[in-house]
Regions:
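Active-site neighborhood of HAD-like aspartate-dependent phosphohydrolases
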Residues: 1-49
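Conserved Lys-Pro-Asp/Glu-containing loop-to-beta segment of HAD-superfamily phosphomonoesterases
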Residues: 100-133
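Acidic, Mg2+-coordinating phosphoryl-transfer loop and its flanking beta/alpha structural elements
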Residues: 125-148
Length: 148
C-alpha cells in the first residue's frame, strides 16, 4: 500500500530554473539534493507527481518531443538515485491563454485528483513560487515553499 502522495513543481524545485526557460536536455540541471529527496520519498513508498507550467511550448521555444526528452533525462537521473516520478502533469499554455490548468489556477491539480482517484486535502505540494502556493491552497493541499 502506498504511503501517500507528494506533488512537486519541476523548475526551481527539482532542477534549476531559468528566465530563458529550460528548452533543451542540456539546460536541465538538477538542484543538488533534489533527486536524493525524491528518492527518499520513493523508498518510503510515496507516489511523487510533478505539476508544472510549461509555457515555453505555447511560446514556441520547444515542442512536446523536447519536453519528453527533458523528462526522460529527469527520470533517468532519478532512477540512478533510486527514485521515480509516478506521473507528470503539465500546462502547455501561455499566461494569456486563459486556460484552467496554468498555476495558480487549480485545473492541473483537479486533473491529478481525477486521474489518480485521490483526495488532495492535506497533500503536500512543494513549490518555489507564490503560484504554487496559491494553487495548493485552492484545492486544500498543503503548500510547502522551497527557496532554491
Amino acid at each position: 500500500m502506498k504511503a501517500g502522495l507528494v506533488i512537486v513543481d519541476r523548475d526551481g524545485v527539482i532542477n534549476f530554473d531559468s528566465d530563458a526557460y529550460i528548452k533543451s536536455v542540456s539546460e536541465w540541471v538538477a538542484i543538488p539534493g533534489s533527486l536524493e529527496a525524491i528518492a527518499r520519498l520513493s523508498r518510503a513508498d510515496y507516489r511523487v507527481v510533478v505539476a508544472t507550467n510549461q509555457s515555453g511550448i505555447a511560446r514556441g521555444l520547444y515542442d512536446m518531443e523536447m519536453l519528453n526528452r527533458i523528462h526522460q533525462k529527469m527520470a533517468k537521473a532519478l532512477g540512478e538515485q533510486g527514485g521515480r516520478i509516478d506521473a507528470i502533469f503539465f500546462c502547455p499554455h501561455g499566461p494569456d491563454d486563459n486556460c484552467d490548468c496554468r498555476k495558480p489556477k487549480p485545473g492541473l491539480l483537479h486533473e491529478i485528483k481525477d486521474r489518480l482517484k485521490v483526495e488532495l486535502a492535506g497533500v503536500p505540494l512543494v513549490g518555489d513560487s507564490l503560484l504554487d502556493l496559491e494553487c495548493a491552497e485552492a484545492v486544500g493541499a498543503l503548500p510547502i515553499l522551497v527557496r532554491t
